[in-house]
Amino acid sequence: KDLDRNTRSKSALENNPNLPIFIMDNFETTIQKVYDMDPNRIESITILKDAAATALYGSRAANGVVVITTVAPKSGEVRVTYNMVGTISMPNLNDYNLMNARQKLEAEVASGMYEAEGEDFWFKKIRIEEYQGKLKNVREGVNTYWLAKPLRTEFNHKHSLYLEGGNEEFRYGIDLGYNNENGVMKGSYRDRIDAGFSIYYTTSKVQVSNYISYGVTKEKESPYGEFSQYTKMLPYERYKDDDGKMLRILQWSRVLDFEPYNPLYEADLGNYDKGQTNVLVENLSVNWFIKPTFWVKGELGISHSTGKREAFIDPLSVKNNLEYGDDRTNVGSLTLTNTEYTSWEGKLAISYNESINNHNINVGGGLEVKTTRRRTNTGTYKGFQSAEFSSPEFARSMPYKPNFQEVQTRLFGIFARLNYSYQDIYLLDASLRIDGSSEFGSDKRYAPFFSGGLGLNIHKYAFMEKYDFVNHLKVRGSFGQTGKVNFAPYAAVPTHEIDIDEWYISGPASSL
């Protein structure tokens, strides 16, 4: 699960642009798909990090490439494989060596927190009353260990079922999976159900493989908020009143700048942040063997996903950030976000491999096209009377304009490669790829990526035969160029923003 850290260091930037690309069975996939898949379905994983190895992937490979090959269905009788993995997730707070309530108050006294010089009578009086209030809580046995309040220990389970069969000419495989993952933060979870169907058709001249999958992921954030909030809490702070009800406001612990609210009170309200994602993937690959040494390969990949997210703030929540005299008819809010993502990927490649005497030549080339489109719309509704009625139809108003966004990218690339060896001792590798992308600036629409390498298999020399304890000794060197687009798709394209709040005789205002 640490591929994103081990291949290249993580970035603190949003969406982690330092992630490598993941290629599964020759098609690009997401890191989430890799995390969710059954490890028993993986035949091999190859991590490409140096420029010479990644140059053929062009403008996407600057952070490395993770190539994954899955296990193909086996011919013969129908086989059913079931796998279940259970894990226990528990928080580890051993690294937090915190003071208890009495120690914290004694440390404040020792630091002179309540003995500031030069203050007038009223400031001194406030400090004394604050100290007396904290001391009263300590003497009454208040010693709240806030770090443990939002946490829990969970048993998670992951199930996978695989059915395979067929004959030498036609094989098929059906995979089903369910992943239940509850977080250590109370109320958080991520559940995923997916299914896939693969077929392999093979003759002496043609090889066809197709894989289609569909997955549904449901997730929910913890109503207890961020764990970092609880690290700021003070142990002598009460979180319940004498009747056992949650306190809305705390006395001394400040979580937000505007008000020291109680996060445990917020957890008892109707706040929620949840979402669902549906993903459909279709991958088709066709190999045509014109000759044993010459073949053509075509690939087509289609991915379509839809997502919906709902974030609701209870009208009783402190997060409404109301001040005295504010209009309370607009308390409570619901933010709905809908996303739609479509990706088309096509590739056509030819390859020729020939051995002539002591010479072995492998050459190939091809082209690749890819287009993606993402649509997002977001709307916020305000003015709810109760958390029990959080549907948009119960909202009082929609104070902000809905936000609609569409982002589309296109990529076209051509590539060529050469692998040559003489007597399997002297090795030569070279590759070239030229990418054209809508994300590049208009002054330079195309970018070249090349690599070259030399190698020497010393263990293949005749004089090495007497050193039977050496079975592999190789010297190699390589050079390559990589690159990556790290800015927004339209950052290199002049765009106009229309301001419908400013109207002139000629129409609405716009800015470049």
Go through each PLM region and give its residues.
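Transmembrane beta-barrel wall of Gram-negative outer-membrane proteins
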Residues: 147-222, 229-241, 277-283
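Short acidic/polar hinge/loop motifs at secondary-structure boundaries
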Residues: 20, 25-51
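Extracellular/periplasmic, surface-exposed regions of secreted and cell-surface proteins
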Residues: 157, 192, 198-216, 257-313, ...
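Extracytoplasmic beta-strand/coil segments of soluble accessory domains associated
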Residues: 1-25, 44, 54-74
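Residues embedded in well-ordered regular secondary structure
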Residues: 1, 13-16, 20, 64, ...
